C-alpha cells in the first residue's frame, strides 16, 4: 500500500488541532509539543509548528488559485457534505464551491479555504471520476 505523506507549517497547534480534527474530521495520531499527525482521509498529514509562508496565485479556468495548496479529490456527495460542514462551522471559503471546466473532460466541483495558519486547501469532485487525469479536448 502506498500512502501520501505531507508536512506543512502551522503557527498555532491548538488552532490546527481544531481545524483538522474538529472541523475536517481528521483523526489525530501521534503528537509532540511541535507537531501533530492527522489521518487525512487515509493519508498522513503532519502539521509542524513554524512561521507562515507566502501565498502566490495562478489563473485556472478564470479563477485565481492559491499556490501552494493541497487537498483531496472526493466523490461528489462527500464533496457537497464537506462544503456544508465547513459552512456550518462558520468558516469562510477562499473560493466558494462551484463547477469549473464545465462540459469538458475535467469538469469538477471545487472549493478552496485556508487553515488557521494560512495554508491553502482545495477539495474537489470530478463529474466523471475516470477523467481525473484526462487531457482537455
Predicted regions and their residues:
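N-terminal beta-strand motif that seeds the catalytic metal site of vicinal oxygen chelate
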Residues: 1-14, 70, 74, 125-137
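Short glycine-enriched loop/turn motifs at secondary-structure junctions
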Residues: 1-2, 63-67, 104-105
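Core segments of cupin and vicinal oxygen chelate
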Residues: 9-52
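Short, conserved charged micro-motifs
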Residues: 15-16, 77-82
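Short beta-strand micro-motifs in enzyme catalytic cores
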Residues: 34-36, 68, 107-111
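A short local loop/turn or secondary-structure capping micro-motif enriched for an aromatic residue
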Residues: 46-47, 53-57, 129-132
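Helix-adjacent hinge/juxtasegments
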Residues: 59-75
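Vicinal oxygen chelate
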Residues: 83-84, 89-137
Amino acid at each position: 500500500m502506498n500512502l501520501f505523506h505531507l508536512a506543512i507549517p502551522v503557527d498555532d497547534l491548538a488552532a490546527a488541532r481544531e481545524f483538522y480534527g474538529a472541523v475536517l474530521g481528521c483523526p489525530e495520531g501521534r503528537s509532540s509539543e511541535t507537531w501533530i499527525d492527522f489521518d487525512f482521509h487515509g493519508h498522513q498529514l503532519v502539521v509542524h509548528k513554524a512561521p507562515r509562508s507566502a501565498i502566490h496565485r495562478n489563473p485556472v479556468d478564470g479563477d485565481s488559485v492559491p499556490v501552494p495548496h493541497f487537498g483531496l479529490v472526493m466523490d461528489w456527495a462527500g464533496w457537497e457534505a464537506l462544503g456544508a460542514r465547513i459552512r456550518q462551522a462558520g468558516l469562510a471559503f477562499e473560493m466558494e464551491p462551484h463547477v469549473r471546466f464545465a462540459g469538458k473532460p475535467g469538469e469538477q466541483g471545487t472549493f478552496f479555504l485556508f487553515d488557521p495558519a494560512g495554508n491553502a486547501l482545495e477539495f474537489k469532485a470530478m463529474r466523471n471520476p475516470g477523467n481525473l487525469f484526462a487531457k482537455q479536448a
